[in-house]
Amino acid sequence: ISRYGLFPFASSLDTCGVLTRSVKDAAIVVDAMKGIDKYDQTSWDSSDIHLYEAIDGKVDGKKLFYIKEITDISNYPDASKELKRHLEIFYETIDKLRKVGVEVEEVSIDKTLLQAIPSVYVCLSCAEATSNMSNLTGIIFGPRGKGDNVMDMMKDHRTKGFSPLIKRRFVIGSYVLQKENQERYFVNAQRVRRLIVNKMKELFKTYDALILPVSTGVAP
């Protein structure tokens, strides 16, 4: 799905998707939206892929996997009732899938690699967001800030225009992109991401899909 027209955050991570109430609805919407777009160089020709037509209801023999370290309640010593219930529902879903012929297997992944994911995400996403949004100065884009000179106008615009959370991300992004920090943080985060990607590619040689709870709780 083309990203043209959307506001970029982290270019190497941003993807488009749809939220629907069923797999069929998702297939219909994505079939209508997918395809190559000359305005998005990351898009590709998917005209030979027809998701809705591929839905035949036959799941027998499909192989799914879930990650033990994420779904094992013993890994959450202070688990809330909500989290416990979410995981109960997850395992109930696994049982239902197995009853209709889907093979679902538990896979263990190195905890060190899994624990690195949040840090890698923060490092890469904040760095890319800082770069992507550096043009929002109030001079060319956005409302004009107040001030007697260009620097004061940009400071006023960016101070008022971004939330505290976004500002914190800019601070992190600017820090990891500094020349003296790039190798230690940004480049190493890219290397760890490659390890994560390679691990997932290896698993998808055996399995058709990954199944996991969407989150450990509702949004705050």
Language model regions located:
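Predominant activation on well-ordered alpha-helical scaffold segments within soluble catalytic domains
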Residues: 24-31, 91, 130, 134, ...
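A short helix-breaking turn/cap at a secondary-structure junction
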Residues: 1-88, 152-156
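Short connector loops at secondary-structure junctions
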Residues: 100-121, 172
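Acyltransferase
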Residues: 51, 82-110, 141-146, 153-157, ...
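Generic secondary-structure signature for well-ordered alpha-helical cores
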Residues: 18-24, 28-39, 95, 99-103, ...
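Short helix-loop capping/hinge segments that flank enzyme active sites or metal/cofactor-binding pockets
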Residues: 58-67, 71-76, 123, 127-197, ...
